[in-house]
């Protein structure tokens, strides 16, 4: 499939940018948080990266209209890195399902108390918000990692608008 972009120097549309980023495969995460009323919120996210090792910090980019972002602004959030069998969770948390947490098994993490999708995530990071900044229609949230849970499993990937599974050589 050939994707054509505007000529250099021309205005880049949201569709152009989305098509470009679809060519960059990445892992799939579900960002979780609990609002002031104790209600869990979550959304599928592929805009996640490590920032620094000292202190251990990562960033996520969340849509400003997201209910999950509102809960994250409470000061803590969880990052659930989905394993190869976590596609259903990725789909549930990327749609307008009313009770997303009723569709998956989850529990409160030990240190931060954030929702951990224990059956769908091969890794979990509990984070404390250190800084956030608005850029366009998204907010970049920097979280200092205070908790890590890991299991050995193959990650779920997303690229070219499709889910895939890592298949290591060897």
Curated annotation (Swiss-Prot):
One Pfam family from the record: Flavin_Reduct
Keywords from the UniProt entry: NADP, Oxidoreductase
SMART domains: Flavin_Reduct
Position of the signal peptide: none
Molecular function as annotated in GO: FMN binding; riboflavin reductase (NADPH) activity
Reactions the enzyme catalyzes: reduced riboflavin + NADP(+) = riboflavin + NADPH + 2 H(+)
Biological role stated in the UniProt entry: Catalyzes the NADH-dependent reduction of FAD to provide FADH2 for the halogenase RebH.
Entry's family note: Belongs to the non-flavoprotein flavin reductase family.
Protein name (database record): Flavin reductase (NADPH)
Protein's organism: Lentzea aerocolonigenes (Lechevalieria aerocolonigenes)
Source species taxonomy: Bacteria, Bacillati, Actinomycetota, Actinomycetes, Pseudonocardiales
